[in-house]
Amino acid sequence: MTDKTTTTTPQSVLSSDLFDGLQADTMERGATISPCGLYRYSLWRKWAPGPMCVFIGLNPSTADATLDDPTIRRCVGFAKAWGFSGLMMLNLFAYRATEPADMKAAQDPIGPENDDALRFAHSNTTTVVAAWGAQGTFKGRDQQVRAMLPRLHYLR
């Protein structure tokens, strides 16, 4: 995966002691965005040492390595309430769009590196939350990801 916006890799966020010395008011932020800027494969926020939670949404919107959008703020709230020390956000479709209709109109809404990002995150954390909602059925993508990642928790 090509990381356009930060030098921290998802691998180091999920599997290292990188955050052992963080102060309470410090949040590590990062994102893996394609060189063309059309796809966001992962986004992470880490506020303390300890386990992270992975969320899989429908598609990325405006959030990036430095900017949070409403979905990211909501997921940070869930992760903190559940006792996690950080989160990684991935999506069924990596195409960046503020409206699902725009994502659905894209030639390749999934993105060439998205399945690799999903598999990596799933294999490197214990809690993966399916949070894609009813529109995840587009192109049968919800079923594809459920088959690829058997250990999912669901938000209802």
Indicate where each model-derived feature is located.
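Active-site and ligand/interface coordination hotspots across diverse enzymes
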Residues: 1-69
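Residues at the starts of beta-strands that form the adenosine-phosphate
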Residues: 52, 85-86, 127
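Short connector loops at secondary-structure junctions
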Residues: 85-101
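Glycine/proline-rich loop-helix segments at beta-alpha junctions forming the active-site rim
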Residues: 2-5, 97, 103-156
